[in-house]
């Protein structure tokens, strides 16, 4: 959930920066901005790849743990989740291609300014965290492990208590 929070917030910030500059929500209003906004294109790529679950990003850690758990419990659910991941990845790649690498058809896009200092600090800080937790996930997992063990213990006690009340 930490990874999802970082990546989702960062993607919304990237879209917000684009909207602030272009004032349009239509994908067709964009295209070919990689040469005009290289810093934004870079951080957008990092967050998009994190959302896809690319190894080396925090998104990979979350997705692989969820899929491994799903395969242990229900093969059908795991397959459905995997299909959802594939469709999500296809959409994200399509979106990135159209917005960032598409053909530059609108002359007014050439006047856009790349990230300012404060936008850059926020977005690059989030990018560093997404990459850092992708390579060092145990900083989060070890901390969460204690809480999860306690939650499981309480859940098991509640089940035992419930079963004893039913008898």
Predicted features and spans:
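Interfacial and helix-entry/exit segments of alpha-helical transmembrane bundles
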Residues: 5-88, 92, 109-129
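Cytoplasmic/organellar membrane-interface segments at the starts of transmembrane helices
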Residues: 37-39, 93-167
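Short alpha-helical catalytic segment bearing the HExxH-like zincin motif
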Residues: 1
């Amino acid at each position: 959930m930490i990874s999802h929070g970082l990546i989702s917030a960062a993607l919304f910030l990237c879209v917000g920066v684009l909207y602030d500059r272009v004032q349009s929500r239509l994908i067709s209003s964009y295209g070919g901005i990689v040469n005009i906004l290289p810093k934004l294109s870079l951080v957008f790529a990092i967050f998009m790849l994190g959302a896809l679950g690319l190894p080396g990003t925090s998104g990979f850690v979350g997705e692989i743990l969820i899929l491994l758990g799903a395969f242990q419990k229900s093969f059908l659910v795991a397959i459905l989740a995997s299909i959802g991941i594939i469709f999500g990845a296809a959409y994200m790649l399509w979106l990135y291609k159209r917005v960032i690498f598409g053909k530059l058809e609108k002359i007014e896009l050439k006047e856009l300014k790349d990230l300012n200092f404060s936008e850059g600090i926020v977005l690059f800080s989030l990018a560093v965290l997404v990459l850092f937790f992708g390579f060092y996930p145990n900083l989060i997992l070890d901390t969460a492990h204690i809480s999860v063990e306690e939650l499981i213990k309480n859940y098991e006690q509640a089940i035992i208590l419930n079963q004893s009340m039913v008898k």
